Design a protein with these regions (language model features):
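Metal-dependent phosphoester/phosphodiester hydrolase catalytic core
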Residues: 1-261
């Protein structure tokens, strides 16, 4: 059962029920076996695709204190997430990269078993991997279809402060990210569209993140210490509006953030 707006209280009440499984028992056990098999055969990385955000996210700034989590994501299947984390930690399975979406926002986190394993958000020590969650290409921001950059930034400040493992969040830009994978590292490059009001080929580089092989955490300083938009834990946001027209490679300064998107 998943939230359908009218039943969120009930789904919240059963969100930590041991019988709930995001994948179902058969696929869940297959998943754990594949994680172990990948590590045993010496694969460098475990790239785990998830439709919804894996990390725990306190979003009471939007949802309120009664039901503060997104119970349509892994926060609605907490025992299943705990079993996944237990399998990774207990078996020493490292180099885990979760890639996810569905939330219409960008989130970058260390993957940590909060309340069970010690985790230091400043250094990333205690993490067992990272998560890169992407925004929507055109669907609206969950915090308001016509949200301004200022309001989006205020919300991201709250979210990053309230969630220890969350290292960066952007709510304003529609966009995508790329993964660049080598044996030594995985780099995630986030891009945003300055406007979706009309068809165009414009994009802005929002942030870049790296995980080194064997580190199991985002490389510090996270994002190189500076991002274009959103909030970066222990970093700063510098808005340049430097935009590239991907059709011809030319750069210009856009100001579409002043428009209602």
């Amino acid at each position: 059962m998943t939230p359908s707006y009218w039943n969120t209280d009930y789904v919240h009440a059963i969100s930590n029920d041991g019988g709930r499984s995001m994948m179902g028992s058969r696929q869940e056990n297959w998943f754990y076996n594949q994680l172990s098999a990948s590590a045993k055969r010496g694969a460098t990385w475990r790239i785990v695709g998830s439709q919804t955000v894996f990390s725990r996210l306190n979003e009471s700034v939007a949802y309120g204190n009664v039901n503060p989590l997104d119970y349509d994501a892994w926060d609605g299947y907490q025992s299943n997430r705990n079993r996944t984390l237990s399998h990774l930690y207990d078996n020493g399975i490292s180099n885990n990269v979760f890639i996810s979406g569905d939330s219409h926002a960008s989130w970058v986190s260390d993957v940590a078993w909060l309340d069970n394993k010690a985790y230091n958000p400043a250094t990333g020590d205690g993490s067992i991997g990272v998560e890169f969650a992407g925004s929507a290409v055109s669907s609206p921001c969950p915090y308001g279809a016509n949200i301004t950059m200022a309001l989006a930034h205020n919300a991201t400040q709250w979210l990053v402060a309230a969630n220890s493992e969350l290292q960066w969040n952007d709510l304003y830009y529609r966009g995508y990210y790329e993964l660049h994978i080598s044996a030594e590292q995985v780099e995630a490059r986030y891009f945003g569209f300055p406007t979706i009001v009309f068809r165009n080929t414009y994009e802005i580089s929002l942030a870049n993140f790296t995980i080194k092989s064997g580190a199991n955490k985002l490389t510090r300083p996270v994002g190189g210490g500076v991002v274009e938009s959103g909030t970066l834990k222990s970093g700063k946001t510098v808005q340049t509006n430097l935009t590239v027209d991907t059709a011809n490679g030319t750069y210009f300064i856009s100001h579409y953030d002043l428009e209602v998107l």
